[in-house]
């Protein structure tokens, strides 16, 4: 499941292989296989209402697709203005109080564990405080990191800390599927049959993985 890049190039100070402007962004957002506008890193452009940035945000709104954020140290009026522009998530939250402020303003916080940034230990109390607004994610995850687990690693850590099973599973699966309007994970008629089979609801060791109804992993290969 993919989104449309919002900042290509990431800054005006680099030479990129391509430029995705607001017109191209709008065209990409019309595609059914692209589900959101990704990581609006240009928060100065949002706060200063840069015309090109705002056209990209408006294109996502017109397409009915959510807009991912990137504003780690945001607070106060600037954070409120950023959210009011239509940006609904942030995966760059580092501090618990910042996470609480974002949730109080209606934002969804993605708790991140990656090869570089690891924020679970700081942010996990949000699971209990705002279960409807929390999601798990990875970011810049190297193969060696993924060999030790993906979202399931955060699920296990949460359960070891005593969090409610259904709040944890909600952050791992239900909340993301609902927020990004992804037709998977519910096993409803017409949805893609994408699911995993685990040994039990405590260890959550993956025994099999199914994608579109086909077993792609059976515990051995």
Question: Predicted segment positions?
Answer:
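Hydrophobic faces of well-ordered beta-strands that scaffold small-molecule active sites
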Residues: 2-4, 36-39, 67-69, 89-91, ...
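Glycine-enriched alpha-helix->loop->beta-strand junction motifs that scaffold or abut catalytic
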Residues: 33-34, 64, 81-89, 103-110, ...
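Divalent metal-binding pocket/active-site signature
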Residues: 39-97, 113-117
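Histidine/acidic-residue-rich catalytic or RNA/ligand-binding cores of hydrolases
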Residues: 49-50, 76-84, 101, 105, ...
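Active-site microenvironment of metallo-dependent hydrolases
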Residues: 146-162, 166-221
């Amino acid at each position: 499941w993919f989104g449309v890049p919002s900042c290509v190039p990431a800054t005006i100070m680099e030479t990129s292989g391509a430029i995705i402007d607001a017109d191209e962004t709008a065209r990409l957002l019309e595609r059914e296989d692209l589900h959101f506008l990704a990581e609006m890193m240009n928060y100065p452009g949002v706060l200063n209402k840069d015309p090109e940035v705002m056209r990209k945000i408006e294109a996502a709104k017109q397409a009915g697709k959510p807009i991912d954020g990137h504003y780690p140290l945001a607070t106060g009026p600037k954070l409120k203005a950023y959210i009011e522009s239509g940006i609904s998530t942030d995966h760059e939250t580092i501090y618990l109080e910042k996470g609480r402020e974002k949730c109080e303003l209606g934002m969804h916080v993605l708790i991140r564990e990656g090869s570089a940034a690891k924020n679970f230990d700081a942010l996990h109390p949000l699971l209990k405080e705002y279960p409807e607004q929390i999601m798990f994610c990875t970011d810049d995850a190297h193969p060696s990191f993924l060999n030790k687990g993906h979202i399931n690693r955060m699920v296990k850590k949460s359960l070891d800390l005593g969090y409610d099973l259904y709040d944890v599973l909600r952050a791992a699966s239900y909340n993301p599927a609902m927020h990004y309007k992804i037709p998977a994970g519910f096993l409803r008629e017409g949805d893609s049959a994408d699911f995993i089979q685990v040994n039990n609801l405590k260890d959550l060791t993956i025994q099999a993985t199914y994608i579109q109804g086909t077993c792609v992993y059976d515990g051995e290969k």
